[in-house]
Amino acid sequence: MTDLTTLEADVLAQVAAAGDLAALDAVRVSALGKTGRVSGLLKTLGAMSPDERKERGAAINVLRDRVQTALNDKKAALETAALDARLASETLDLTLPAPRRRKGSVHPTMQTMDEMVAIFAEMGFAVAEGPDIEDDFHNFTALNFPPKHPAREMHDTFFFNPAKNEDGSDGERMLLRTHTSPVQVRTMLSQKPPIRIIAPGRTYRCDNDATHTPVFHQVEGLVIDKAIHMGHLKWTLETFLARFFETDAVKTQFRPHHFPFTEPSAETDVQCDRSGGEIKVGQGTSWLEILGCGMVHPNVLRACGIDPDEYQGFAFGMGVDRLGMLKYGMPDLRDMWSSDGRWLAHYGFSAFAAPNAASGLS
C-alpha cells in the first residue's frame, strides 16, 4: 500500500499548491479523470485474485474519497478568497451623495380628466364607465344615427372584422367606440330617471392632425329628469368652465348645430385671446369652439325605454386633450403621445398633486 500513500501525498500536495480554480481543476482531471492517476489504479483490479481485489479496491476508494474531499475544500477556499477580493475592490463610499433618479409625472391628459371629474363630482354628477369595444346599437342606432350616416363608414370609425356565425354567415360587426355616448345609453337602459352622470374615457376615430389624434379622451355628461330645459344646460356648462379655467371671466356663446342624438343642438365657444402665439381663455375678442351639447333627442329616450313626454334631458361632450391644451398652453395635440420624456417633464404633474375642487385644481 506504500504506492497509494505516496500517490495520496503527491496529489494532496498539488491540491494545496493550486492558486486558482483553473489550476485546481487541472489537478482534479490528472487525479480523478478517466485517465487520471487514481482512476487508473481501478483498471488493475481485474488481474488480481478476489481477496486481493477486495482489499485493494477498498484502499483505492478511500484514496479517491480523500482526494475528492481535499478538492472540494480547496475549491470552497478559493471561491471565498475570490469573493473577498472582489468585495474589497468594490467598496462603497457611503458619504457620497446618492445618484439622482428622474421622477415620473402624471400625464397632462390624466391630470385634466381628474380636474374635470372633480368639478362635476362637486356639482352632483356620478361617474359612469363602459367598454371601449362597442356594438352598432349602443354606438349608433340607439343614438338616432341614420343607417347611411357618414360616421358609420370605415373612413371615420375603426371596425373589427365580423365574427362568423355557426352557419358561416357574418355576425355582428364590433367597433371601437367613437364617443363615450354608449355609456349614456347603457345607463339609461339600466337605470330609471332621475339620472345625472358623466362618462370619461378613451375614444377612437380615424383622424390625425395637430388638433386630432386617432385615440383621444372625452368627458360626456347626461342629465335626465322632469322639466329639464336648455337653461339648465347653459348654467351647468358655464359653471364648469369657470371652475375649470379658474376664472369668472369666461364668456361663452352657443351656436346652433346638428347632432343626431340631441335636438336642439349647439356648439359652445369660449371667448379667448389668440395674440402672441398663445390662446388665453377669459380675455380677447376671438371665439374658440370647445364642446358640443343639446337636449336629448326624443328618439334616444324612446330607444332607451324612457317616455319623452314625462322626462327630458340634456347631454354634452368635450375633448379632454383639447381642454388640457387650452389650459396649459400646449401647441400640438400630437406631442401628448410622442413619448418624449422632456415634454412630459415640462408639462407633467406631481403624483401628489391630485386635483380636488376644495383645495384647488392645479
UniProtKB/Swiss-Prot annotation:
Domain of life of the native organism: Bacteria
Natural source organism: Caulobacter sp. (strain K31)
GO cellular component, one term: cytoplasm
Gene3D superfamilies in the cross-refs: Bira Bifunctional Protein, Domain 2
Gene name as annotated: pheS
Taxonomic placement: Bacteria, Pseudomonadati, Pseudomonadota, Alphaproteobacteria, Caulobacterales
GO MF annotations in UniProt: ATP binding; magnesium ion binding; phenylalanine-tRNA ligase activity; tRNA binding
Entry binding sites for Mg(2+): E263
Protein name: Phenylalanine--tRNA ligase alpha subunit
Cofactor(s) the record lists: Mg(2+)
